[in-house]
């Protein structure tokens, strides 16, 4: 993906509001991705003005899935027309939550591919991810994901 500034993440993830937990991709390649997400009062995982632990894990999973998901699209496909994907967390190998962000804060998620197995139309992968605000780490985790092309 060469022009990530024009990338509409909704075209590459199967999630839709109110369950979309990524606003934009900051950088992406075959082994790393960085995303951002602004916490809003109407987010499904906000309770009493705080984005919950479950929301942080879901944000990490959506961020992680974009590394493997991008391989199902052509390099110049910034419209997300090349494939439709589904995916889910198959295991949470480890998770540590240090703090939860408040409404109005923007979180940054950085994920790295640890391992990957590809079959004809699906991938099973392990990824590590950290989620932070500008001044502190909120979450670190290792997730297993299953990603499948459905068309």
Locate the predicted segments by residue.
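Short aromatic-glycine motifs in intrinsically disordered, low-complexity regions
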Residues: 6-16
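Hydrophobic beta-strand-centered segment that forms part of the acyl-chain substrate-binding groove
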Residues: 2, 68-110, 142
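Beta-strand-rich interaction surfaces with strong enrichment in secreted/lumenal proteins
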Residues: 10, 24, 48, 96-100
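HotDog/MaoC-like acyl-thioester-processing domains
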Residues: 34, 66, 70, 101-151
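Short coil-to-beta-strand transition motifs
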Residues: 15-21, 103-108
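Ordered, amphipathic secondary-structure segments that act as subunit-interaction surfaces
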Residues: 20, 62-73
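Catalytic strand-loop segment that frames the active site of acyl-thioester-processing enzymes
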Residues: 16-56
